[in-house]
Each structure stands twice: as C-alpha cells, then as structure tokens.
A protein has these predicted regions:
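Amphipathic, small/basic residue-rich leader segments at the start of a protein or domain
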Residues: 1-114, 125, 130-134, 138
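Glycine-rich loops and low-complexity Gly/Arg-rich segments
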Residues: 101-104, 121, 172-175
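Glycine-rich, Trp-frequent "lid" loop and neighboring beta-strands that shape
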Residues: 86, 126-176
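FAD-binding core of FAD-dependent oxidoreductases
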Residues: 107-120, 141-152
Length: 176
C-alpha cells in the first residue's frame, strides 16, 4: 500500500457498515425506552437533598430501560474486545457516543457511562484474573458502579500520569 493510499484510508471518517445497524438500534432504544422516562426520572429527583443518591422510583425507571437494552443486545458495546463488548472501532463508537450524548440517561441505560466505561476498559486490558472476577464481571453486568479520582492539589488533573497519591497497605488497612 502506498503512502497516499494509507493516508486516504485514514481520512475516511465514515461509520463502518457493520456498525450502522447498531447505531440504528441505539437510536430506536433511546427514542422508545429512554426519552419517555427522562422527564419523570428528573421530576422524581427534584426534592432529594443528596445529588449522589437516587430518589424513590428513579432506579426503577432506569432499570426498565436497562432491561430493554439487555434484551436487545445493547449492552457494553463500547468495549473494543468482541468477547466483552461489540468489537467496535473508536470511530464507530464515536458515532454512537454522539447519539448517547443527546440524552442524559442514554449512556447509563446501555451500561456505557463514565467512569465505568474507562474503568472497565482498564480492567479488561490489564486487570488480574482476581480483579476481573471481583470488579469487571459485576461492572459488565451493571450490578455495581465505579469511581476514578484524579484531582490533587498542585497537580494537573486532566492527565492520570501526573497523579502522585499512593495507597500503602499498613497493618491490614489501606492508607492513602
């Protein structure tokens, strides 16, 4: 392949034919299962004092949309590994992520919301068998949520390589 042919291929920003039906299914899922519950979800949460918790009824609404997503095979497709995800390229996922970004509940309904997506990808790529069993499996199943902290005093928080905090096991407890 010549340099010009390689460059032409790199400039092709079209979604693959393989991913187009998935995009159509995602749009349909959002329209039929997420959009109809969104106003009620946020209405139910209006009076809660803690922004990090759910008000009664919110999780039930979201679980209904998640159940439909699972039934329709719209679950964890952001992962590039075809065994745990859909095997999409970053470009194909970008088209889908653009649709997910139009709805405040769409990503969560498909188990594709941050920080879980990044944490699952890290666990999938470099996690130990024990870490995958303990954390990746329940994350992939949508049974737990995860977190990633990367803001520190006097440290640029946009690049995880700059993190200086450490955790040391002392007397059976982790000291941060």
């Amino acid at each position: 392949m010549s340099h010009n042919e390689a460059m032409a291929g790199m400039n092709n920003l079209e979604m693959s034919e393989k991913a187009k039906p998935l995009l159509a299914a995602v749009i349909k899922h959002i329209r039929e299962n997420v959009d109809p519950i969104t106003d009620e979800y946020f209405r139910l949460g209006e009076g809660r004092a803690d922004r990090w918790s759910h008000a009664p009824g919110q999780l039930e609404l979201l679980e209904t949309a998640k159940k439909k997503a699972r039934e329709n095979g719209l679950w964890n497709f952001f992962l590039p590994n075809a065994e745990t995800g859909e095997g999409l390229s970053n470009l194909d996922y970008a088209y889908i992520a653009a649709e997910l970004g139009k709805s405040p509940l769409a990503s969560e309904s498909l188990n594709c919301s941050a920080p879980d997506t990044g944490n699952m990808e890290v666990l999938e790529r470099i996690g130990t068998a024990e870490q995958k069993e303990k954390w990746l499996k329940p994350l992939l199943a949508g049974e737990i949520r995860s977190a990633f902290a990367m803001t520190e005093p006097d440290m640029a928080s946009s690049d995880a390589k700059n993190i200086s905090t450490s955790a040391v096991l002392e007397n059976g407890e982790w000291v941060i």
